[in-house]
Amino acid sequence: MSYESKKVTVAEEGSVVTVTPRSGQIATKDIEVTLGLSPKSLEVYNTKSGTNYKSMPEGSYSFDQKTVVIKKGELVAPTVKVSIDPLTKEMLDSGDKFALPVAITAVSGGQQTLEGADVMIYIMDQVIITSAPVLTGTKPITMEMRQDYTVTQWSLEMRINMSELGDGVTPGVGYPGPPSYQNQAIFSAGPGNGIAEDGEIYIRFGDGPIPGNILQIKTQGTQVNAATKFKNNQWYHLAFVCDGVKLTIYVNGNIDATLDLPRKPLRLVKNSFGICNGDWMVTDAIVSEVRFWTTAISQSQIQNNMFAINPGTDGLEAYWKLNEGSGTEFKDATGHGNKATAPNGVVRWVDGIRSDGK
């Protein structure tokens, strides 16, 4: 049994969905239909889809009517409007995802409903409005992690918006050909001994013959380029997932490139982590939602949690929302105490960043 789902964008003023109960055949008499919520159906949906949606709390939604009638000789009942309030700050801060499992809970006259077709799971897609710092090579973020790491599986996520990405392959602006803006590193961490094969996560735009608008990751002595040609001043969600055998790059939740790995542990020392901390990083980068995992996350996890996630999720080692709006210190939402600071300050803060891109 599976249930249909539908995503609902919930803006600052809330949202309204409509439900129209219908019969599979012309009603031979009046049929009274009652609507409500089915938490059990949401549990089944979560199990089958690998999600962990919480039911919207009581008082955060309302039906304009719960009982409607399919008249004799008709197929459908009057439409029911369900009003949904915006998610509260507490709900947003939790990182949990919410849904409204609307179901036909009763039908008069012993009429039967088609199991699975009597439920609709409305997935709440709350518009998140946040702030984020602008970084560059002279104003990076450096981390002091709580420990060193030796891992066979890991994942890294971030949202990023680059102000300038070259489309040439020359060393710099002063050389013939279009600007390349090579080796613009947006994240790095390493083993501390300078031997890349022992560890290293090095993510950059541009590499010699690789144009500056192409993303590349180096790890364990090998590297792979993304297929996407990135654009200036556009938000992207990036995820890099290592399952111990293969590295996968996701761009906006979609698989972009893969790389076979040498199947050995990755070593990273705690003071080697940094964002936009390379000398070649000369343009501005707005960065948000940086997460480091000690497990390989799934594509559905990536797609369902681009703008927020529960900080207590298993395997989430560090989570910097970078939404403070001011200052040079950034909180690790997991509570693990992984420190992130901008020792030279940030270029500026950008406010009013919306998850719906408006």
Residue ranges of model-derived segments:
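Extracytoplasmic low-complexity segments
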Residues: 118-135, 307-358
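Extracellular/lumenal carbohydrate-interaction signature centered on repeated Trp-anchored short motifs
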Residues: 144-156, 227-234, 280-286, 310-313
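Extracellular, beta-strand-rich glycan-interacting domains
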Residues: 153-164, 281-305, 317-326
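Extracellular glycan-recognition modules
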Residues: 128-212, 297, 301
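Short beta-strand and strand-turn-strand segments in soluble, beta-rich domains
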Residues: 43-68, 219-220
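Extracellular glycan-interaction surfaces
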Residues: 125-132, 200-262, 348-358
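Short glycine/proline/serine/threonine-rich loop/turn segments at secondary-structure transition edges
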Residues: 88-99
